[in-house]
């Protein structure tokens, strides 16, 4: 005789086994910047620097006091003789003693005849 109608479909099968994990996705965008932390402690003191160059010369000092007087100098050479003095006044008149008698005079002239 003729072929019969198809039978009723069977029930669905069981789910298959879980597939393998997919590849890792790309990294996400960077997050926002965090808040700035507090300042750190002060570092240790640095080494002492080298000695600086000498300063400029000072201003000149005040003038000193005058020294004591020196010893007396040697005696100078003798000067030349001065001019002659003025003529003196006339002396007083002399008071001579009376001189001795003079010699006898010559003979007189002859007498008259």
From Swiss-Prot:
<feature type="modified residue" description="4-hydroxyproline">
    <location>
        <position position="72"/>
    </location>
</feature>
<keyword id="KW-0272">Extracellular matrix</keyword>
<keyword id="KW-0964">Secreted</keyword>
<keyword id="KW-0952">Extinct organism protein</keyword>
<feature type="compositionally biased region" description="Low complexity">
    <location>
        <begin position="75"/>
        <end position="90"/>
    </location>
</feature>
<feature type="modified residue" description="5-hydroxylysine">
    <location>
        <position position="33"/>
    </location>
</feature>
<dbReference type="InterPro" id="IPR008160">
    <property type="entry name" value="Collagen"/>
</dbReference>
<feature type="modified residue" description="4-hydroxyproline">
    <location>
        <position position="107"/>
    </location>
</feature>
<feature type="modified residue" description="4-hydroxyproline">
    <location>
        <position position="39"/>
    </location>
</feature>
<feature type="modified residue" description="4-hydroxyproline">
    <location>
        <position position="60"/>
    </location>
</feature>
<protein>
    <recommendedName>
        <fullName>Collagen alpha-1(I) chain</fullName>
    </recommendedName>
</protein>
<feature type="region of interest" description="Disordered">
    <location>
        <begin position="1"/>
        <end position="113"/>
    </location>
</feature>
<keyword id="KW-0677">Repeat</keyword>
<comment type="subunit">
    <text>Trimers of one alpha 2(I) and two alpha 1(I) chains.</text>
</comment>
<feature type="compositionally biased region" description="Low complexity">
    <location>
        <begin position="1"/>
        <end position="36"/>
    </location>
</feature>
<comment type="similarity">
    <text>Belongs to the fibrillar collagen family.</text>
</comment>
<dbReference type="GO" id="GO:0031012">
    <property type="term" value="C:extracellular matrix"/>
</dbReference>
<keyword id="KW-0176">Collagen</keyword>
<dbReference type="InterPro" id="IPR050149">
    <property type="entry name" value="Collagen_superfamily"/>
</dbReference>
<feature type="modified residue" description="4-hydroxyproline">
    <location>
        <position position="90"/>
    </location>
</feature>
<dbReference type="GO" id="GO:0005615">
    <property type="term" value="C:extracellular space"/>
</dbReference>
<keyword id="KW-0379">Hydroxylation</keyword>
<dbReference type="Pfam" id="PF01391">
    <property type="entry name" value="Collagen"/>
</dbReference>
<dbReference type="GO" id="GO:0005581">
    <property type="term" value="C:collagen trimer"/>
</dbReference>
<feature type="modified residue" description="4-hydroxyproline">
    <location>
        <position position="6"/>
    </location>
</feature>
<feature type="modified residue" description="4-hydroxyproline">
    <location>
        <position position="84"/>
    </location>
</feature>
<feature type="modified residue" description="4-hydroxyproline">
    <location>
        <position position="30"/>
    </location>
</feature>
<comment type="function">
    <text>Type I collagen is a member of group I collagen (fibrillar forming collagen).</text>
</comment>
<feature type="modified residue" description="4-hydroxyproline">
    <location>
        <position position="54"/>
    </location>
</feature>
<feature type="compositionally biased region" description="Pro residues">
    <location>
        <begin position="103"/>
        <end position="113"/>
    </location>
</feature>
<feature type="modified residue" description="4-hydroxyproline">
    <location>
        <position position="15"/>
    </location>
</feature>
<feature type="modified residue" description="4-hydroxyproline">
    <location>
        <position position="12"/>
    </location>
</feature>
């Amino acid at each position: 005789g003729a072929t019969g109608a198809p039978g009723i479909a069977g029930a669905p099968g069981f789910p298959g086994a879980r597939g393998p994990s997919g590849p890792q996705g790309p990294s996400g965008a960077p997050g926002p910047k965090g808040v700035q932390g507090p300042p750190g402690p002060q570092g240790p003191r640095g080494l002492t620097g080298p000695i600086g160059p000498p300063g400029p010369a000072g201003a000149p000092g005040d003038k000193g006091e005058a020294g004591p007087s020196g010893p007396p100098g040697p005696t100078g050479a003798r000067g030349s003789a001065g001019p002659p003095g003025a003529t003196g006044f006339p002396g007083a008149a002399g008071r001579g003693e009376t001189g001795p008698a003079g010699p006898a005079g010559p003979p007189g002239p002859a007498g008259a005849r």
